[in-house]
Amino acid sequence: MDQECIENYAKVNGIYIYYKLCKAPEEKAKLMTMHGGPGMSHDYLLSLRDMTKEGITVLFYDQFGCGRSEEPDQSKFTIDYGVEEAEALRSKLFGNEKVFLMGSSYGGALALAYAVKYQDHLKGLIVSGGLSSVPLTVKEMNRLIDELPAKYRDAIKKYGSSGSYENPEYQEAVNYFYHQHLLRSEDWPPEVLKSLEYAERRNVYRIMNGPNEFTITGTIKDWDITDKISAIKIPTLITVGEYDEVTPNVARVIHEKIAGSELHVFRDCSHLTMWEDREGYNKLLSDFILKHL
């Protein structure tokens, strides 16, 4: 699996950040990826390695305090810090070379924030199930909860309002929500499970996000850069699943703000479209990249 991938650590802003660089045999472009969470790991994005066959070298990394990377002081658990970390890593590995940037979920928020500041270092931007506003995303997730079968909706509201996140009925309802809106598959790939395990084990998810995907009580809860993203002028592709927990309405706001951006809704998919339609997803991304070399 990893014969064409190099794993290593880079010292970034005083801490060691893990990365995996999967090189294309005949490289045409470089793609830097940003995982979600905040607090997951790069593992669930590994399906994107398939794009090396199209001449696209893919960089994966575990953000600060995530996966295999070291944790900075918790005062640095911010999106701004994540932007500077990404820029330092890009510069360290690729120098002045422009790359494509893809962010998934929270990584899409991070990628938008990066592009607002550093789009001169990018050839193009891909936002996959990403967001420009946490409050809007939470509002949309609450709408999805309201549309759940009564048994699950009531359990989420009853136990969520009292913070009883460990209650078995609440956990069952969360699991149901995830299988509708996170990954619509009975058997979840080991790469996805590994990322979820890291989120559970490390501190970032709990501190920056909160107890679960739709209960965002952490430090990012008020984050919103919707009014800044119209400054992004590079080629931009926005993807979202039809049943995505970060809904098509959230994606449309980004699409409307970034002039000339493309929006693609994956039918019958939810949040982790890279697994639900692996072939179609990788083709869409590689076609976009190769079109904007």
Curated annotation (Swiss-Prot):
It catalyses: Release of N-terminal proline from a peptide. Cleaves H-Pro-AMC as well as a wide spectrum of amino acid substrates and several peptide substrates without a proline at the N-terminus. Proteases F1, F2 and F3 degrade oligopeptides produced by Tricorn (themselves probably produced by the proteasome) yielding free amino acids. It is an enzyme of class 3 (hydrolase). Transmembrane segments: none annotated. PANTHER family: HYDROLASE, PUTATIVE (AFU_ORTHOLOGUE AFUA_2G14860)-RELATED, MONOACYLGLYCEROL LIPASE. This is Proline iminopeptidase. The keyword Hydrolase applies. The lineage of its organism: Archaea, Methanobacteriati, Thermoplasmatota, Thermoplasmata, Thermoplasmatales. One of its GO terms (cellular component) is membrane. It holds the Pfam family Abhydrolase_1. GO terms for molecular function: aminopeptidase activity. GO terms for biological process: proteolysis. Its EC number is 3.4.11.5. Belongs to the peptidase S33 family. Part of the tricorn proteolytic complex. The active site is at 105 (nucleophile), 244, 271 (proton donor). Keywords: Aminopeptidase, Hydrolase, Protease.
